[in-house]
UniProtKB/Swiss-Prot annotation:
Family that this chain belongs to: Belongs to the DHBP synthase family.
Protein's name in the database: 3,4-dihydroxy-2-butanone 4-phosphate synthase
The encoding gene: ribB
Subunit note: Homodimer.
Keywords: Lyase, Magnesium, Manganese, Metal-binding, Riboflavin biosynthesis
Binding site for Mg(2+) 2: E38, H153
Cytoplasm keyword on record: no
GO-annotated cellular components: cytosol
Function of the molecule: Catalyzes the conversion of D-ribulose 5-phosphate to formate and 3,4-dihydroxy-2-butanone 4-phosphate.
EC number: 4.1.99.12
Record InterPro entries: DHBP_synth_RibB-like_a/b_dom, DHBP_synthase_RibB
Catalytic activity: D-ribulose 5-phosphate = (2S)-2-hydroxy-3-oxobutyl phosphate + formate + H(+)
Pathway: Cofactor biosynthesis; riboflavin biosynthesis; 2-hydroxy-3-oxobutyl phosphate from D-ribulose 5-phosphate: step 1/1
Root EC class: lyase
Amino acid sequence: MNQTLLSEFGNPTERVERALDALRHGRGVLVLDDEDRENEGDMIFSAESMTVEQMALTIRHGSGIVCLCLTEERRQQLELPMMVEKNSSHYQTAFTVTIEAAEGVTTGVSAADRLTTIRAAIADNARPSDLNRPGHVFPLRAQPGGVLTRGGHTEATVDLMTLAGLKPSGVLCELTNDDGSMAHAPEVIAFAKQHDMLVLTIEDLVAYRIAAERKAS
């Protein structure tokens, strides 16, 4: 990643720490992955504090595939089977079956309905019966070890929530351009400025976690 493009958001450590602070205060962040990987930017929000307005922004400016990133423990708690037994996707993106809240939604498509589904899934006492399958929210299972084992947006989302001291569940959606194409670094940065959001990279988060673990040891 061209660090010059991101310099206005701080150095790598500052970018992570500012992103964590933003998440603690209920704001969203934008996360870029490697140029040699998907080379895309995702909007990421805390699942426990996301608002209807933020969900509407996500749907309006994103791919439409609103994903809920979960730990393996939460996936098991909700008894969500993986979408396929043999994952042949290029980056091994770990989708489970899609979900809908069993109560409190209409068609499940609106911003409010999708948020209701997410809140049902992350509730402390959530049960499998609280969710219908299929639905309009796409859960993703994060790998144990986070970005240190897989450099994906799913793992970055759960790592960010954990480091921020929040529930380890987050909402992500790929940012798209007005013509429907995927947003890359320049477009992501322009969107961030327009919507007062912070930008960081998965590479920043990997370095931050490695430094933190070295310090702890």
